[in-house]
Amino acid sequence: MSELDDMTTVTERPAAFSLDGQEVEFIAGETIIQAATRAGRYIPHLCWHPEFAPHGSCRVCTVKVNGRSGAACTVRAAAGQAVESDTVELNAHRKTLLQMLFVEGNHFCPSCEKSGDCLLQATAYEMGMEGPRFEQFYPSRPVDASHPDILLDFNRCILCELCVRASAEVDRKNVFAIGGHGIHTRLLVNSESGQLGDTDMTLGDRAASICPVGTILPKRRGFAIPIGQRRFDLQPVSKQPQPDGGAK
């Protein structure tokens, strides 16, 4: 028997970081939120989706990595990192961001078709938000009902750009875009009229089903599932089995 055969094989431990004091293993190249989600750990988020590259616009997934703030959807996991997410400070920061989103748009949950299936609403509940903290903007935004199968309600848009990315990267149609600056930033429809009905978007497009809020809705299905029996009515966002806990 050779010396090599007689040697005890040492199995290397997978690379890992700590998330709120608990070890999370990761695959090389994964971001913190990817590794955490794969391990069944919830980090609040709105614009992140596992099907797409990180966007980093909502900042709801902000965590502290070795004491420094960073977006969990863009920061790569590394061995030995000490990541904090579920802290009083970070949750207060997230709650403030959510309160700002609610007043910047027109989000009226009791009458919204998306209630109980809305990631914004579910995340607000998760963060303990009970009402607006800031003065409502009440912006004047249109509702586009020009498409035979899809309703487009700009009042609820949170500028996550998931529909923009889905239409461009999956559907290969580029139906949506973002225009404007500051508080005037808005979702645009890429047609001469600016109407969704003048695009080639269909109900089967990924962009038609990925909206985490109530901006893009299929017509004639609004209350097919009664309020009280919807996804987030039955189970909070932090306990959801979906890989992103949000948009399907």
Locate predicted features.
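Fe-S ferredoxin-like electron-transfer domains
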Residues: 3-4, 59-63, 68-248
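A short beta-strand micro-motif
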Residues: 16-19, 63
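Aromatic-flanked redox-active Cys/Sec active sites in thiol-based oxidoreductases
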Residues: 21, 49, 152-155
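Short, well-ordered turn and helix-capping elements at secondary-structure junctions
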Residues: 21-23, 191
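N-terminal cofactor/phosphate-binding cores enriched in small/glycine residues
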Residues: 23-78
